[in-house]
Curated annotation (Swiss-Prot):
Species annotation: Bacillus subtilis (strain 168)
Record-listed Mn(2+) 3 binding positions: 822, 834
Cofactor(s) the protein requires to work: Mg(2+); Mn(2+)
Binding site for ATP 1: 129, 169, 175-176, 208, 210, 215, 241-243, 284, 298
Binding site for Mg(2+) 2: 298, 300
Residues annotated to bind ATP 2: 711, 748, 750, 754, 779-782, 822, 834
Name this protein carries in UniProt: Carbamoyl phosphate synthase arginine-specific large chain
Residues at which Mn(2+) 2 binds: 298, 300
Domain MGS-like: 925-1027
Amino acid sequence: MPKDTSISSILVIGSGPIIIGQAAEFDYSGTQGCIALKEEGYRVILVNSNPATIMTDEAFADEIYFEPLTAESLTAIIKKERPDGLLANLGGQTALNLAVELEETGVLKEHGVKLLGTSVETIQKGEDREKFRSLMNELKQPVPESEIVDNEADALHFAESIGFPVIIRPAYTLGGKGGGIAPDKEAFTAMIKQALLASPINQCLVEKSIAGFKEIEYEVMRDSNNTCITVCNMENIDPVGVHTGDSIVVAPSQTLTDEDYQMLRTASLTIISALDVVGGCNIQFALDPFSKQYYVIEVNPRVSRSSALASKATGYPIAKMAAKLAVGYTLDELKNPLTGSTYASFEPALDYVIVKFPRWPFDKFKNADRKLGTKMKATGEVMAIERNLEAAIQKAAASLELKNIGTHLPELSGLSIDTLWDLAITPDDRRFFVVMELLSRSVSIDDIHEKTKIDPFFLHTFDNIIKLENRLMEAGSDLSFELLKKAKEKGFSDATIASLISKTEEEVRALRKEMGITPSFKIVDTCAAEFDAKTNYFYSTYFGETDGDISRKEKKRALIIGSGPIRIGQGVEFDYSAVHGVLTLQELGFETIMINNNPETVSTDYEIADRLYFEPMTTEHIVNVAEQENIDFAIVQFGGQTAINAAEALEKAGITLLGTSFQTLDVLEDRDQFYQLLDELGLKHAKGEIAYTKEEAASKASEIGYPVLIRPSYVIGGMGMIIVDSQAQLSQLLNDEDSMPYPILIDQYVSGKEVEIDLISDGEEVFIPTYTEHIERAGVHSGDSFAILPGPSITSGLQQGMKDAAQKIARKLSFKGIMNIQFVIDNGNILVLEVNPRASRTVPVVSKVMGVPMIPLATRLLAGASLKDLNPAVQNHHGVAVKFPVFSSHAIQDVDVKLGPEMKSTGEGMCVAYDSNSALKKIYTRVWSQKGSIYLQNVPEDVKELAENAGFTIHEGTFASWMEQEGNSLHINLSGSEEARKERLEAMTHGIPVFTEEETVRAFLQSGSGHPQPVSLKDLYKKEVASCTQ
């Protein structure tokens, strides 16, 4: 069936800012989908408020709207753009919920918009717990004993009738938001309130707990001809009870018999056919490990986190195919681009094993509740590919960028057996490492299985690693060829082996190469070598010979180092930079080699770089790839702190770094050298010192004068930063040795206006598209600040002063490429706060708002062009953008959103308008439309007057009485007290927006005069182009 020619324009709904449960995987799926639609000649209208994404670039859509993802906003865009079709199954839960709302309110019918792909009826059958259960009963597909409830009384009555523990699953939510396992009545009573609040239709499923069953997922595709295939099946190492996003996942499944596999495959195909899904669908099962009894847990009638994982695990482009199916194609009409010969109706086959390992934010949030359950808490994930499970597990662990040594966390070595058992039975993010610690202490596999319900197969796999560790320690420096080869085959890194035999990583590498033990590189081809595949997708292993032909061509080869897993401080914006670096290098005639390990991202789409290597971002693996490819140079400016941290080791390995030498990086990261540089250039900065001991820290803080800012070096996202107001507070902080990784930096804290610039330089001149002004004072991390660009109060004199400072720094360092500089304006004085010699998280924002392709320009400068050659210019526009932070308070409990120098937001959004008040008002559309009650604490009197003048009602009673009433719009709480923290957390758990900074409050209240209307990026630009003189 050919494509649908009755439609010519399609509205695509994106997933919005990154939050836990809905992250970079939707940029990958959305980008694939937009590319697929553009290939077919459709006009694509994209609505997505996330500026950090690839999909919101001009190349992927004809009109791009950074607008609130609300039904009201989409209705206005539909009236303006008059699309023929709407595609909602690429934008996660956000897009699905909006599609249902637009259908139910009659907007789609009124404006003649056809919902493409999966119908609203199908969405409701998958998402509405009552309709889902009814359909499963019709199909005779077993579901756990359950009850659909819409009030607390009915919920409690049912829970008590079936007995605790029970699982609570809210309808129309993602990442298990609002749900969980309630072990008893007390926990249930608290959880059911939050669960009903979390569901947009106030509906929950309360079901008998089947925690401890195996959790199995099938990723399935279906077309309009009812042709169905399973793309991939996956097995969670953690049993049912831990959200799949928080579980280590293996593909293909490892412990199912063929009968089990076929039984669940048949059930998957039955379900997707009955749902009438057109596109991709994820189906989750619970399987009794002691029988053939299974239950259907959940169906996601859309592309999902698991879809992205399945796509990267198999090489099958699920989102791209889903978009093509949505416009009428069938699976037997579409070719798999990875093989070039098989059709999309051909089920992938794997001759390797993949492991997905979640990445949690608890290295930043040490006091948060890290226990795992049915509510997802991971911010991102890594994926590893290997020929055996032991090696895949070890590669995945090496990809996490934690303080682990192989499969061990040093912090666990001092814990008692009883404490380790507690952590294993009631799991948190360290569970895998806890199990490895138990095994290393000779605890039996049977005991661990009995208490954790982890399948013995996986535990034996883990124990194989421990046994090989013991053999390596016994051998010591007398390491045989056979033992070293075995260790490498099982995934032991050079660094881990070095730690076991008391040698350096360099010594192990030299010994390995001397023995002729080097990796081979195998291809991912979707067909297990059954067909001749033209693939460029590789992974390393120590089995067999290298696949494919990578013989040297005439082109120079560039290695681009990616940014690894999504975590707070290093999000999808760095993938944006890496992808544009690759595309520009290709335009310039280079062969591009991408190394990364994040299955959610566009950069790990095999169609982006000339060759893709899915590998840990460690020195060993990066150097292995560089040697295999015989690269000419590497670029570390586009991969965030991950790539920057690899710079020294890469230079030592003889790899040329383009644009940024390690010496330059060291000058900017080491505070002593940095301040010496600024002093030499005559640039003002806050007073700062380095302290190597507790006593030195106390002495230097007193010398500088309070308040001071304390932080470690070489970090991103402000990790470990804190503002200290007094000697007493410092003493308390210094007594906590774990929080102070010496040496530490102690800077004078200056509370002024913060401004940042993203610039490009050829080593002589600099080009600055705009000056981004933070709304909050300095001291609030730039990633957590609201920011306006172009900055409205940055005078021409201040602009010139900042440009002069930037030019002095770039010339002194002979810096080429892209750089971010943060300034504080204090009583008219310009102080240099920080210089980041890499692409920053604001690069995508600046690029899109100002119409300047920052990364392509920076890449050309790295390749040898001058600014004079490029003559960059900003597009003349008559609008403004406001960037705003987004926090995942629904997932990470006990983390206060009181802003400070350590970043806490998981993502960012952006709204554009013709004035700043209108842009700001869009961010809080629902608050302004409601204009309900506000609770104020510790605010100036005139703020109260501003709120009343804006039409809000001020609650004069206690916080407790305010929380008992309905119609609450906003909690404004500027206090730093413990009571205030608890109040903020309670407000957030009820979905009430919270402001913690006076500057944000004032900007918000002033925005009431704005007049929001849909504004696309193209609407902002005029036809003529103006040269940038900043």
